[in-house]
Design a protein with these regions (language model features):
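Flexible "arm" and connector segments at domain edges
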Residues: 1-124
Length: 124
């Protein structure tokens, strides 16, 4: 069975190339531009996710649209993968960094997370 994260990264690379963005050939200047573009797009998708859940305490007519929430989460993955690719992260590198950061997060929780030590992130 293919690695699902690898498949998602490959599919996103193909979609981005079809749109006209190839992270393999970007200059550093283009990378900065696309990091900002993807970060803004992520912010917009997060806002759309928020609007998909009933958060307006003053409105009684709201309903939870779970299907739309799922779609927004997937949209977030699209831009998050694009962002990872724009900064040169592969699926394997994301996985490895996630595993290391998860270990740091657990250690912080075990210690009561009373102090945030940025040195914890140096090895990630």
């Amino acid at each position: 069975m293919d690695d699902k994260l690898e498949v998602m990264f490959a599919m996103q690379k193909e979609l981005n190339r079809r749109i006209g963005q190839d992270t393999d050939t970007m200059t550093d200047e283009e990378r900065v531009e696309w990091v900002l573009n993807y970060a803004r797009a992520l912010g917009q998708e997060l806002a759309e996710l928020v609007d998909s859940v009933p958060w307006k305490w003053w409105a009684k007519y709201q309903q939870f649209d779970q299907q739309n929430v799922k779609v927004e989460v997937v949209d977030i993955f699209h831009f998050l993968i694009s962002l990872a690719q724009a900064v040169g992260l592969s699926a394997d590198e994301v996985f490895e960094a996630y595993m290391k950061k998860n270990k740091v997060n657990f250690a912080r929780q075990d210690a009561g997370y009373v102090v945030k030590d940025e040195a914890d992130n140096k090895g990630i």
